[in-house]
Amino acid sequence: MQPTLFIDRDGTLIDEPKTDFQIDSLEKLKLEPKVIPALLRLKAKYRFVIVSNQDGLGTDAFPQTNFDKPHNVMMALFESQGITFDEVLICPHKPEENCLCRKPKIKLLDHYIRKNLFDIDRSFVIGDRETDVQLAENLGIRAIQYDPQKMNWDLIAEKLLGETVTNCGKRPPRFAEVIRQTKETDIKVQIWLDEAGVNEIKTGVGFFDHMLDQIATHGGFRMNVQCKGDLWIDEHHTVEDTALALGQALKQAIGDKRGIARFGFVLPMDECKAECALDLSGRPWIKFNACFKRDKVGDFSTELTEHFFQSLAFSMLATIHLNVTGNNDHHKIESLFKAFGRTLRQAIRIEGNEMPSSKGVL
């Protein structure tokens, strides 16, 4: 069985027009940024299969010839760069037809399932829509939801290849595992600081899971977080104790700090202006400046954002300054987690062998 990437076409490989959601002319054909370099890096490890819904293909509203011309040019372009797809699987039906082959249904992939043609543990669906995520669930594999800003092709390749981005000095891999058990929570955190990859995060708080994934993704490392907390009361203990366990794991994985950059700074992120400054100083401190209009984003209390970073700073013995301005609370919180991840990525990067302190210790 071969590791396989089942890849959506419109909005993932190529840009999807927001006017009519059809690529029916050469003028509309536009590759997504960095898709060719990413696929070139991935092709040694994965087989590629395109799986696409094309509403009304073959009808007067979307003639087959109008589809074929830009599609064939796209395929020829990929092939000219050394990228080939084993198959192109297309559902031509509209949602109201309720067919069996339209994503997230799996009939298009029946032969892959019956003949065990893909490695369940090492195959992924990559697409920009929730239906792509649901397709992965129906296949029993994992999904990576493409987004040109939040999860672009560079990040996807980095995740799938597990490439080292923080250990330029080629020191021994930095790993830590922390188990924290209290009356309120049971938490296990594993961190691979020098290995990017797909993160397994389950805290029971969906928005919080997404935020933790942002830290690891933009930090250039891989982590697993499993938490069972007293969510029947609220999410406070889950968020706080996860921050404490994560901070402890980061501190352990970083180790004696010899050779690290120590400092990090980044701004802005997304349409919000999020600033983060970090010093792995051994002296815990937090300066947090953010105002939220809503009490909750999804299942996450906005007031816990500051508490998370405060708990994290004191657990990992770091100085953290965070500031964000913007209009959308969801985007503001997400930009803070992403900015922290990017800043942490700089600070944990190994650049030599010296202790980054005039005192000789951190």
From Swiss-Prot:
GO terms for molecular function: histidinol-phosphatase activity; imidazoleglycerol-phosphate dehydratase activity; metal ion binding. Its cofactor is Mg(2+); Zn(2+). It catalyses: D-erythro-1-(imidazol-4-yl)glycerol 3-phosphate = 3-(imidazol-4-yl)-2-oxopropyl phosphate + H2O; L-histidinol phosphate + H2O = L-histidinol + phosphate. The active site is at D8 (nucleophile), D10 (proton donor). One of its GO terms (cellular component) is cytoplasm. InterPro entries: HAD-like_sf, HAD-SF_hydro_IIIA, HAD_sf, His_synth_bifunc_HisB, HisB_N, Histidinol-phos, IGPD_sf, ImidazoleglycerolP_deHydtase. Its main location: cytoplasm. The keyword Metal-binding applies. It comes from the Bacteria. Zn(2+) binds at C91, H93, C99, C101. Residues 174-362 are annotated as: Imidazoleglycerol-phosphate dehydratase. Its EC number is 3.1.3.15, 4.2.1.19. PROSITE patterns: IGP_DEHYDRATASE_1, IGP_DEHYDRATASE_2. One of its GO terms (biological process) is L-histidine biosynthetic process. Pathway: Amino-acid biosynthesis; L-histidine biosynthesis; L-histidine from 5-phospho-alpha-D-ribose 1-diphosphate: step 6/9; Amino-acid biosynthesis; L-histidine biosynthesis; L-histidine from 5-phospho-alpha-D-ribose 1-diphosphate: step 8/9. In the N-terminal section; belongs to the histidinol-phosphatase family. In the C-terminal section; belongs to the imidazoleglycerol-phosphate dehydratase family. NCBIfam families: HAD-SF-IIIA, hisB_Nterm, Histidinol-ppas, PRK00951.2-1, PRK00951.2-4, PRK05446.1. This is Histidine biosynthesis bifunctional protein HisB. The lineage of its organism: Bacteria, Pseudomonadati, Pseudomonadota, Gammaproteobacteria, Pasteurellales. The gene is hisB.
